[in-house]
Amino acid sequence: MNILPIMEKFFTIQGEGSHTGKAAYFIRIAGCDVGCVWCDVKESWERHEHQETEISELIESAKASKCNFVVITGGEPAMYDLTLLIDGLKAEGIYCAIETSGCYPLKGSIDWYCFSPKKFKLPCEEAYTKADELKIIINHPSDFAWAEEHAKKVKEDCALFLQAEWSKNEKILPQIIDYVKSNPRWRISLQTHKYMQIP
């Protein structure tokens, strides 16, 4: 696939997960059929509302940022064959990460696989073996048990993160803090970009 539907691309700071605080060039691919009710980028769901962009243009824009770390996100980016995009970025010496629900097998050899499963659509089995990072959004206290079910299936060295659903942050974050203190293999992911008021 030489073109992809792109909602936006921008240079910022990665705000969450293992790479928090790093300068990062984001490529947000449009299109998602997972349907998280609390999604903060619902405008990314409809691919046909966004411009089809040449992969070569995406690679050039990432190069122009002079950032050697690209995050491919969505939407659900794994809906598409990302081989040409990932290979093209890596050929330029750019480290590539993806943020995915794991609902689709990934086409492309990614450097960092952030797996954030959702209850609305079950992930495929390969997501558990590929995951470098498991990030669970905590929306309700019952989600802690759900997080543990997924943690049992990932690799032993997979980084484990719990992140509060943003609209419930004040209520949920204290519960996450207590949980991580009692279960220290988990770490807290804060959406620090929202505190910094950056994209």
Q: Model regions: which residues?
A:
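Conserved Radical SAM active-site core
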Residues: L4-M7, F11, A23-A24, A30, ...
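A short beta-strand-turn-helix
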Residues: I13-G17
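Histidine (H) residue identity feature
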Residues: H19, H48-H50, H150, H193
